[in-house]
Amino acid sequence: MTANAILEDTALAALISSKICHDLAGQIGAINNGLELLEEENDEDTRYYALELIQNSAKAAWAQLDFNRLAFGVASSLGAVVPLAHVEQVARRYIENGKRRVHWQANVQDVEKEHAKLLLALLAVSLMALPAGGDFYVGLSVTKPKERSKARLKLIILCRGRSARVPEGVADVFAGKDTRAIDGRLVVAYYAARLASEASLKLSAGKEGEDIMFTLEPL
């Protein structure tokens, strides 16, 4: 990544913090609305709706927080190597709903924490490729390292669904273009590109027939 394509760490932290707050605002607001309904309403059906709203919103908020903790945080309790089953569980809780489905294939049981962060960050970016929902096919392979060498990671995320598209600006961010266009929408793509660069990996995004493919592979 070239010098003029590197965002200052303070700006990166501010943008990621803003995105996390923005993403959680909907769920927290819904929980608050449900609590207000419980305080104000005596109708049994309304109270049942309020409890259901609180429960569903709390689950969604927890899934978002758990995803953000591993993707953007230190997650020190997990150690340097993370069980891939845990990463998959975190990803599924965050992504899957009535409109989105995840299909997972991997040749390893554990991944380095930085690779787990990259995987989750790229998954978050890939959501923008299917605004109407669809299927996300995750293919992960890791070449076991020789002594004193790091594991070599290759990751493919294939996005298949109606109105599939390469998210505007993402390819430029992956290519290391000027950071002036980076905002809350593109900050995760930039974060993924920074992680990839530090790990001697490269990111790409493009069309594969009617599908959209995101690729992470060694330089």
Show the residue positions of the predicted features.
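Conserved catalytic segment of histidine kinase HATPase_c domains, centered on the N-box/ATP-lid region
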Residues: 38-50
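Conserved DHp (HisKA) dimerization/phosphotransfer helix of two-component histidine kinases, i.e.
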Residues: 47-101
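Conserved short strand/loop->alpha-helix "switch" segment adjacent to the catalytic nucleotide/phosphoryl-transfer site
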Residues: 5-15, 99-127, 131, 179-181
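Short hinge/gating elements
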Residues: 73-76, 105-109, 172-179
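Conserved ATP-binding N-box helix of the HATPase_c
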Residues: 14-34, 39-41, 114-143, 188-198
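Glycine-rich nucleotide-binding loop
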Residues: 208-215
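Glycine-rich/acidic phosphate-handling loop/turn and adjacent ATP-lid/helix
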Residues: 147-187, 217
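Glycine-rich ATP-binding loops of the HATPase_c
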Residues: 200-207
